[in-house]
Amino acid sequence: MIEVVVGIGAGLIGIGAGYLVAKKINDANYSIFLEQAKAKAKAIEFEAESILKDAKVKVNEAEFEAKKRYEEKGSRLQKEYNQKLDDISKKEHAILNEQEILKNSKDELEKSQNQAKTLYEEGLNLKIAYQDKLSETLKVLEHVAGLTEDEAKNMVLRKVEEKSRAEIAHIVRKYEEEAKKEAKKRANYILAQATSRYAGEFAAERLINVVNIKNDELKGRIIGKEGRNIKTLEMVLGVDVIIDDTPHAIILSSFNLYRRAIATRVIELLVEDGRIQPARIEEIHKKVCDEFEASILEEGENILIDLGISKVHPEIVKLIGKLKFRASYGQNALAHSLEVAHLSGIIAAETGGDEKLAKRAGILHDIGKALTHEYEGSHVDLGAEICKRYKEHPVVINAIYAHHGHEEALSVECAAVCAADALSAARPGARREVLESFLKRVEEIESIAISKEGIKGAYAINAGREIRVIANAKLVNDDEAVLLAKEIAEEIQDKIQYPGEIKVNVIRELRAIEFAK
């Protein structure tokens, strides 16, 4: 019994001791957990403060940027406002000048009317005095010479007539000179009005385009293995592809603006695509040609909309767009035609003509230049023929002939076009004679080659020192290609004057294509 009691007591003591130990451990763990929780809370608090500080910094930066943008925009708007105020002030000044000119013209007109009235009254008085003098003279003659009244009257009339003719001739010359001076003054005023109210842009056409590339490694890919790619490019595009030490640039040279523009776009697409090979070059070339045909029509439509001209045949609209890729004496044909259209409208309006009809004749006066690369004949004859075919207004056709002196100007609108054409062409720096003679020589060289039978195309390259002729392999064999080169060279030598020598390069390529099915 005692042992049982002792055992129970020992057990209770063990339990109590265990409880105390466990409690102590729990207290220790609680302290640790509490410290950890406090540390985490401090870390979270620190992180929150850091985020708050970052947010405040960003807010301040955003406020600063917004304030800066606002100030810049305000400054820009203020400048624009000041500029518009200056423009308005200039226009007001111009209007005041116009009003002053009109007032002076009105005063001069009133003065002229008063002078005419005075002269008329003086003429009446002179007539009365003349009648009185005539009667008196007749009486004297009858008394002195014993003449009859009719004989005396005829003698006096002859003398008066002779004297009157001399006086009339003097008066006519005087008023003719005054009329010429007034007409010249009026013409100068109209031309000054036209040129001041139209400020056109001008940029001389170049003979090269530059294609920018990302790195010079692409130059090797464009040249291709054994030069295959560059040969295909030059043959298909009809331009001179120049790859030299110029960093990140490929130069395209050709006198033909249309070919050069297409070539530029083709090479840009090839570089962007990365697949540069002969078949891909031809595919991209066809795609770009189709795009350009569509863009030419759109260009023509936009120009006519800007000018306020309607009811123009689509073929003529397309030719207007094509003028963008033609040049005359270094002056872009479309820019020249637009300038002539605007000036013609202003001159016609000032002289009492139809402004819209003058603009129509102005934009179409050089339309034949869009066809000179494809058909034989002068741009005047080609332009008149195409306008007659599509039933354009007779004034337009007259302007096409008259601006080169082939016909007389038969209307105010036509005369306005002739004057505007002379203004645009004669402006200093507008045209370059040497460049035009070079372009004409190159075109003649190409036309000689194309005129031969079995030739698909001909492209002058290397500044006109070489012509590359593409022969149809089905119509021309190798021996005939040699003869063609000789014939073309001889004809160029006989018909064209040029410095140095011209290389004639006839290319005949046969492609056999079959599909495995």
Swiss-Prot record:
Q: Sorted alphabetically, which keywords does the UniProt record give?
A: Cell membrane, Endonuclease, Hydrolase, Membrane, Nuclease, RNA-binding, Transmembrane, Transmembrane helix
Establish whether keyword Ribonucleoprotein is in the entry.
no
- Lineage: superkingdom: Bacteria
One GO CC annotation: plasma membrane
Q: Where in the cell is it found?
A: Cell membrane
What Pfam families does the record tag this protein with? Answer: HD (PF01966), RNase_Y_N (PF12072)
Q: Which residues form the HD domain?
A: 333-426
**Enzyme class, first EC level, given as a word:** hydrolase
Q: Which residues form the KH domain?
A: 207-273
Q: Where are the transmembrane segments?
A: 1-21
Gene Ontology biological-process annotations: mRNA catabolic process
Listed InterPro entries: HD/PDEase_dom, HD_domain, HDIG_dom, KH_dom_type_1_sf, Ribonuclease_Y, RNase_Y_N
> What topology does it adopt in the membrane?
Single-pass membrane protein
EC number(s) on file: 3.1.-.-
Name of the molecule in the record: Ribonuclease Y
The source organism is Campylobacter fetus subsp. fetus (strain 82-40)
